[in-house]
Every structure is written in C-alpha cells, then in structure tokens.
Amino acid sequence: MEEDRHGANQGNVPANRALLHALAEKFPNRESVLTQLGLLRAKATLPKGVIHVVSDVHGEAEKLKHIINNCSGGLRSLLEEIFAGKIDQGVFNELLTFIYYPRESWLVRHGQLGAAPARRALVNRLIPREVELLRHVARGYDLAQLDRILPAAYAPLFREWILAREFDRSPEFFAATLENFCACGGELELLRHLARTIRNLFVSELIVAGDFGDRGPRIDGVIDHVMHHANVAITWGNHDASWMGACLGQTACIATVLRMSVRYGRLSQLEQGYGIPLKPLEQLAEAEYGNDPCKCFEYFGPALRNEPLLGRMQKAIAILQFKLESQTIRRNPQFGLQGRDLLPRIDPANGTVEIDHKSFPMSDRNFPTIDWNDPSRLSESEERCLDQFRESFQSSAVLWKQMSYLAQRGAMWLRRDCALIFHGCVPVDGAGNFLPFEVMGSSVSGRKLFHAIESAVHLAFREKDPRVLDLLWYLWAGPLSPVFGKDKLATFENYFVADKEARAETKNPYFHLINDREFCRRILREFEVDVENGLIVNGHVPVKIDKGESPLKASGQAVTIDGAFSEVYGDHGYTLVLQADRTFLAQHHHFESVADSITHGTDIIPTVQVIQEFKPARTMADTEDGQELRAEIAALEALLEAYDEGTVGKAVG
C-alpha cells in the first residue's frame, strides 16, 4: 500500500479475522458499529476541505506569514460575504487586522486604549463577530475533526460558542463566557487562539511545494511560521535538499548554503537564527584574499559587513564549495558529473578554463588556496574553516529541529484530489521518455525514481549514510534530479566566465512538454492520478509574468506556481487553491510590512485565475480521504456481519 503521505491510499482494508478482532475492541457491539458507520457516511457528505499550495518561498518569512494569515485573500472575501452592510469599513479593517495579527494589533491598540473599560469595549466588539466567523468556517467539519483542531485549553469554550445558536443561548450566557478573560487580563491570548483557530479551520491543509530558503531574508522564520500551522505537507525542492544536507554535515552542501547566504546578504539567518558564527569565514577571507578586490563577487541585500569583506567572504566560500563539489563528484562516478569537475580544467598559465570541450577566458586569476597539482585539495586554512562550520551546522539545535521537520513532513510528490504536486519535474528526454538514474545501487525512473529518492532522504536522517548525504548534494544541482531539472548549475561560470554561451543553463524537456496534453496524461498515469481531471502542479521555474507568460500551460493540465515570491526575483507569488467547487490561482503582489498592515489596513488582495470548476461541488467522498472512509466503512460492515453471524464476539442488543 502507498505511503499515506502521498494521499494515494489504494485498495480496501482486508476483512481478515485479526483486523475484525482488533476492530471489535474499539467497537464492542452492534450499536457502536452502527453509530460509527452513520458518522462515517455523514462525514463523506461534507464539503471537501480547502487546500492551499504555495511554492518557492525563498526566505520571505514576513510575506509568507501574511499570505497564510489572510488565507491567500480568502478571509477578506468571506468577511465581505458575512458582514456586507452590517459593519462600517473601520470596524471591518479592525476585525481583519485582529484576525491576521492579533498579538501585534493588541499591542498597538493596548497603548491607545489605556483604561480597562475601553479594552473591554474592543473585546466586546471583536469577539462576537469572530465567533460568527468561527461558526461559519466550522461547518465543513464533523465534531471529531473539530476536537482535533481546537486548541486544548480553549476547546470547551469554542465548542460552546459554535453550538450556542443551536441551543438558543442568551446574550447573558455569551457575556458570562467573556467576563473572566476581561477581568483577569486574558483577552490577548483569547483573541490570539481564536484567530489562529479561524485560520486553521478556513484552510484545512497547507502544502509547501519546496524551496523554503535562500535569496530572501530568513529561512528559519519561514519554517518556524509553517510549523505553527495545524496541518502541513511538504514536497522538497533543491534548496531544501542543500539545507538538509548541510544540517547532516555534507560538506559541499554546507559551503553552498554559506555562499548563498553571503551572496544575498542573509547572514542573520545563520548567526541569529541558527547560532552559526561566521568568524571562521571572515578569518579565511582576510587571510587568503585580504588584498583581492573580488570584483567578480557581487552581493545582493543588506550589507551586514563592509563591502570589501563581503566580496572576499563570498570568494573564499565559493572556492571552497568548488573544491568540495569536485571531491563529491569523484566519490560518485554514478552521478555522471565528471564534466562539471571544473577546477582541474583551469589553465592557470593562460587564465582559461575548458568547459564542454571549449576554452574560455577567465575573469579572475587569483586563486591562492589552489594547489594546481591537486586542485580539489583543501588548504590548511580551508580545512580549519570547514571543520569549524561542520561542527556548527551539526550542533545547531534549531537547524536540526527545522530540518527534521522538513524531512518528516516532506515527500517527493503528493496527490490531493486530482492534483499531482511536486517541486520540479519528472526527468525525461526530448521524446518524453522517463530518464533513469541510479539511487542506492538501483537504476530507477519516473515514479520509482521519486520513491527511491524519498526513501533515501528519510534514511539520511536515520543513519547519515555517506552515499545518501552525497545524494542530497546531487538533488541540489544534478541534471537528473527531479527537484533541479537543468543540464547544469552554472555557478562557476557566472563568477569566472563572461561568455554567455558558457553560462547558459538548459532546462529538462519536461518544462516544454507539459504544454502537450498527451504528455501530461502520461505523467498523470505514471502517478496514478485521474487523467481526465488531473492537474500537474509544480514550482521551481519562475513564471515571467512581466513577459506575458502564463502559469497555466497550453495543455490545460499543468500549472506552474512559482510566481517569483522573492523580491530578488519579482515579488509576486501564487497560491493554488483547491476548493470544493473550483481550483484557482491567487496571484499575490508586493507586501509592505506587518506594521503597515496594522496601522493602515494594507493587505495583499490577490488576482484570481480559475483553473477548474466542479459541478456539483466535491465532497469528502470525492477525495483521498473518501477512499479512506470507504475502506473504514467496508471494515465496519464486515464487523457488523460478523456480529450478526456470531463469528466475532457476541452481538449485544
């Protein structure tokens, strides 16, 4: 049976005797079986939950937080629907900001309100309307599901509020539930948990389709916020692979994430977020490149060190990265990357490098740490620097916690409803044939390649097998990596070779072929997704909106949701929203700041593009959860029959 993480639960539960006896312990008589059967069949009639899929966040923690908190614009639309004509714009904006940012909004308003009566008036203005919203978003859940989502300390109260209208509770009853919170200073925590519950009920599942970090300010902030969401699933991207590899001590991955952090001026995520000091790199840079202007090493983002030092730091870690990549390539001939082992191809006398059998002049010829008799060997200063960083990365508790979370919640692909979700591509040749790649000694392609890689990643976090650690680096930049999908990553060329021919990176044919409907159907069949209604969803390759590109491909069965979330690459971003009645893309725009949202009511109001519509609207029965419900129902029906026949226990009643 497929792993549950993929949402591809297949087949019915066998009605064998051992299972029936186990079920009989939980449902000891006919009445309990009939009750559960009724509840399961009723659950199958509920509308399917709303799923949001985002991708390529790249460290933009504050923007992601806003998109999660405003449910990709959905909460604003729902409030407009519920409160149209009932409240003025000022109260509407106040309500929104307290749902998006309850703590921050309270701290701002607390100083303005002063005395307790004014704070009580604010609570009395907000809570009844938030409870009305809570009742609305709770409709799609049965009581057992609600109990799993409601915060434990507040669950009895929130349950009372949800059911109060059905029980015709008096205004005095409702006011009494608030009294102690106002009298004892518990208003903020109440508002905070109520807002989070509303958001968690509005979006039943958040899927992040890869690339949590790099380029943007704080990968640690992105993961921290995602970890607070009630129900999260992840498909890994190539940037996630490099961070997981670095956490586990793979040296080329360590150098890669260090170089990216320095290049984009994202030092705070290392120093403050993960407690990884950069002093070893500063010392290496000053010792080996102290008089080097490092003109080839531009940086982006805030200058948290002086400009010359940042350039030297970037060059020092880049050379170290290329050496460590060379060693990784030589350890793994099965990767087929001998042509990317570029340091031995440098001619230091002539200042040229041979790439793909062609010689190119180099823009930089100062390499004091390279021994041209053994170019991939680390110098003593580089060894010291690397040893310190390896220790720092492997001993960071926060990094281990966050990368373990990515590993545990992550997969190479997911299926939700009729959507096949993965980060990058399925590696194919020009004719659309699946390309094989060797994983842990076995040559695999297509869906089997995804499964083999997924198993290897989980193995890496259990055993730290060196072969698997090197595979994590290959996932970052290997041509047959499903999360990379290009012939090369031209980092070396971008630094040292001005010729655009050498810098060119060619995408896997997959990215063109997804415009072809028959190719998409082949992919959907490979992953056992409905070929008629199936939709392939991937990120990784930014949609060039400004150049007229569309996220929806010509096939109508593939969509790319990398909208250039990062400011560095366009400051857009998409959420794919899977609702009961439709699937649509919400395109996001620039987000100023949390402070601006609170003080001026600014919001990201997305542009919506409908991808699919469903009539009638889909229910739980139409989803993967519906498959699971049918399997549970079949098992319970078998137990009921066994009770009636007297073959299991003795029916009561």
Put a short name on every predicted segment.
Residues M1-G653:
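Feature recognizes metal-dependent phosphohydrolase scaffolds
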